[in-house]
Structure formats: structure tokens, C-alpha cells
């Protein structure tokens, strides 16, 4: 969706600096040269001089080479921050100890049913931001009707989604909730 995002930002009339743009290097582009090429392609599709955050999608393939490409682009100012996603503690520790610039962000599935407390502590030890992918558990396990979340929400006049987001934020986890509904977007900020 990089082309569409780039076009939308350009057409919005809002200064580029007001947006925080994240992209990922996919497994199919792993390895130093291929990853670097894909970063340049992302910049071109987005019609931008820099990307705020670039992540490795998963720890498969030559992810060390991929990370070296991201470090290079970071040093060149093409990326403002670099990190990983779906790196559980063992893989995270491994890469954090053997790269020049440790990951600044690790995006991993995190929600009230899968809190990733051990992973969080590991990231914290490396000054890495823990970013939640799927803070609503993708709606699984009847998430929005969960009895505990609903009860807490009633107490504070909030939705179960708001309760779940608040829990993560209070525990120093960055959240990226997904919705296409304007009213839910507004609720997610409340």
C-alpha cells in the first residue's frame, strides 16, 4: 500500500513531518543488497526522502543482512528509526547483541490475552520500544464482548477496546489499533 499512502499524504496538504510512516522489509527481500534495494523502492513508492520507521517483517532468511541494509539506510538519513517485528526474546537478544545499532522498536503481537511480559522486559533492557501489533487480538476470543473488559469499561464509562488500549499504554506498550470506522478511531484516542 506504499504508493497509495504516499499519494494520500501528498494530496492531504498536511506537511510530511506531521505523519509517522512505518514500513517493513519483507522476507522475500531478505539479504543486504536486496533489502537495501527494497528500502529505496519503498522511498520511491512513498514519494518521500525518508521513512520514520523501517522494520524487518520476520526473523527468517538472511535477516542479519537485511538489518545491515537498514543500518546503512539509517546512517544515510533515509530511515529515522530501525527495528524488527515478530522477534521473540531469543531472536531479539541475538540480533541486538550482534548489530552495530540495536533495534529501536520490536513490533510483536501483544494484547490483554497475550501480554508478552518476558519479551517486554527483554526489550526494556535494550532500550527498545515495545510496539503492539494486534492490540485487539484481531477480534478473536470474542474480544470486544469479554466479560472482564466490559465490566471495567462500565466502571469507567469506556468501551472494552478503550480499556484494552489503556492497559497496554499504562504498561509502556505502544499501540497501533486498526479500524476503518471513524467513530472507533475517535474512541481509540479517548
Predicted feature descriptions by range:
Residues 21-24:
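Extended hydrophobic secondary-structure segments that form protein cores and membrane-embedded regions
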Residues 10, 26-73:
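Glycine/small-residue-rich loop that forms an oxyanion/phosphate-binding "nest" at active or ligand-binding sites
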Residues 1, 53, 83-84:
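Short beta-strand segments at enzyme active-site cores
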Residues 1-19, 136-137:
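N-terminal binding-site loop/beta-alpha segment at the start of enzyme catalytic domains
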Residues 15, 47-50, 78, 102:
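Short loop/turn motifs at secondary-structure junctions
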Residues 1, 27, 87-89:
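Repeated polar recognition positions within modular binding domains
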Residues 58-190:
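Beta/alpha (TIM)-barrel catalytic core signal, keyed to glycine-rich beta->alpha loops juxtaposed to Asp/Glu
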Amino acid at each position: 500500500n506504499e504508493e497509495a499512502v504516499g499519494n494520500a499524504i501528498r494530496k492531504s496538504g498536511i506537511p510530511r513531518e506531521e505523519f509517522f510512516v512505518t514500513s517493513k522489509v519483507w522476507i522475500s527481500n531478505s539479504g543486504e543488497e536486496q533489502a537495501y534495494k527494497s528500502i529505496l523502492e519503498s522511498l520511491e513508492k512513498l514519494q518521500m526522502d525518508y521513512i520514520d520507521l523501517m522494520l524487518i517483517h520476520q526473523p527468517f532468511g538472511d535477516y542479519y543482512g537485511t538489518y545491515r541494509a537498514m543500518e546503512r539506510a539509517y546512517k544515510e538519513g533515509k530511515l529515522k528509526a530501525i527495528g524488527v517485528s515478530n522477534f521473540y526474546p531469543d531472536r531479539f537478544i541475538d540480533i541486538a547483541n550482534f548489530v552495530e545499532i540495536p533495534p529501536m522498536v520490536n513490533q510483536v503481537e501483544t494484547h490483554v490475552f497475550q501480554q508478552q511480559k518476558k519479551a517486554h522486559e527483554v526489550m526494556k533492557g535494550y532500550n527498545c520500544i515495545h510496539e503492539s501489533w494486534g492490540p485487539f487480538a484481531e477480534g478473536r476470543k470474542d474480544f470486544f464482548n469479554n466479560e472482564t473488559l466490559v465490566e471495567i469499561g462500565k466502571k469507567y464509562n469506556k468501551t472494552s477496546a478503550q480499556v484494552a488500549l489503556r492497559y497496554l499504554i499504562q504498561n509502556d506498550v505502544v499501540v497501533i489499533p486498526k479500524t476503518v470506522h471513524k467513530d472507533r478511531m475517535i474512541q481509540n484516542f479517548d
